[in-house]
From Swiss-Prot:
It comes from Mycobacterium marinum (strain ATCC BAA-535 / M). It catalyses: (S)-malate + NAD(+) = oxaloacetate + NADH + H(+). NAD(+) binds at G12, A13, A14, G15, Q16, I17, G18, N106, Q113, T130, G131, N132. The keyword Cytoplasm does not apply. InterPro entries: L-lactate/malate_DH (IPR001557), Lactate/malate_DH_C (IPR022383), Lactate/malate_DH_N (IPR001236), Lactate_DH/Glyco_Ohase_4_C (IPR015955), Malate_DH_AS (IPR001252), Malate_DH_type2 (IPR010945), NAD(P)-bd_dom_sf (IPR036291). GO terms for biological process: malate metabolic process; tricarboxylic acid cycle. Substrate binds at R93, R99, N132, R163. It holds the Pfam family Ldh_1_N. The active site is at H188 (proton acceptor). The keyword NAD applies. This is Malate dehydrogenase.
Length: 329
């Protein structure tokens, strides 16, 4: 275990997702049993005491791979030299808040964090945004970090991707490992489009295996898209452990690469592929290698899928317009 520690910065580290995420990172879930991790944890001042308690628990686990922990409320200190930044902390939507209020509140957070990353992060920085509205928060951070290559920013749609795999596996009676090439298009919101028309179940086309368009339209798509709300309804709190798990999955795929026979979903900067306007951060099917992603090209998009992709893309364009008018990008 001679490799130098990967410096992983996590924002909102004392929150619910952070509480699940930090122990996964420290135990080696990200890069395996041979790469030590240094955690750099950012929180707002009032949450630092709670974060100290979490660090006590991390200490008490005596994780062999955890080489150090630094906590604080100053992004420039916490992001200094970071190789991976997981931006989990975000302002939740409160009672009476309009979406524009939410965009504005988070805009201030992600503007400041983008600027700090731009100044002090390591040259090989990768930035994953989990805090919602994730796509547009990633766009704001990216825009405020002009010296970091734009392809180094991604927003999390891996949770939706994992949810879609789970639903399809249950429907077809196979293991989740038998599902390949699932795709989430668009925004991490209720307009997202979980697309199984290119997915495979044990090597066969998923839509043909399911052979039930009504199930796809009336159950599969809305169940995946509205799963977060269903969990809040059942649990009385938002999905935290599954979001943390997906955050680890996404970062691991990004850093270590995708298998030759599969792809993953990541919200990344559009190059105009599949009719998604350039400059939006939208979810696509991507392959990864050596820490870089590539949008899967050449997939046929039928009329049904086209309408769904256009709808979620329009929402992303509206969000970009709103934050542009707020002067955030």
């Amino acid at each position: 275990m001679s490799a130098s520690p990967l410096k992983v910065a996590v924002t909102g580290a004392a929150g619910q997702i952070g509480y699940s995420l930090l122990f996964r990172l420290a135990s080696g879930s990200l890069l395996g049993p041979d790469r030590p991790i240094e955690l750099r944890l950012l929180e707002i001042e009032p949450a630092l005491k709670a974060l100290e308690g979490v660090v006590m628990e991390l200490d008490d686990c005596a994780f062999p791979l955890l080489s150090g922990v630094e906590i604080g409320s100053d992004a420039n200190k916490i992001f200094d030299g970071a190789n991976l930044a997981l931006l989990v902390g975000a302002r939740p939507r409160g009672p009476g808040m309009e979406r524009s209020d939410l965009l504005e509140a988070n805009g201030a957070i992600f503007t400041a964090q983008g600027k700090a990353l731009n100044e002090v992060a390591a040259d090989d920085i990768r930035v994953g945004v989990t805090g919602n509205p994730a796509n547009t928060n990633a766009l704001i951070a990216m825009t405020n970090a002009p010296d970091i290559p734009r392809e180094r920013f991604s927003a999390l749609t891996r949770l939706d991707h994992n949810r879609a795999i789970s639903q399809l596996a249950a429907k077809t009676g196979v293991a989740v490992t038998d599902i390949k090439k699932m795709t989430i298009w668009g925004n991490h919101s209720a307009t997202q489009y979980p697309d199984l028309f290119h997915a495979e179940v044990k090597g066969k086309n998923a839509a043909e295996v399911v052979n039930d368009q009504a199930w796809i339209e009336e159950y599969f798509i809305p169940t995946v898209a509205k799963r977060g709300a269903a969990i809040i309804d059942a649990r009385g709190a938002s999905s935290a452990a599954s979001a943390a798990s997906a955050t680890v999955d996404a970062a691991r795929s990004w850093l270590l690469g995708t298998p030759a026979d599969d792809w993953v979903s990541m919200a990344v900067l559009s190059d105009g592929s599949y009719g998604v306007p350039e400059g939006l951060i939208s979810s696509f099917p991507v392959t990864t290698k050596d820490g870089n992603w590539s949008i899967v090209k050449g997939l046929e998009i039928d009329e049904f899928s086209r309408g769904r992709i256009d709808k979620t893309t329009a929402e992303l364009a509206d969000e970009r317009k709103a934050v542009t008018e707020l002067g955030l990008i």
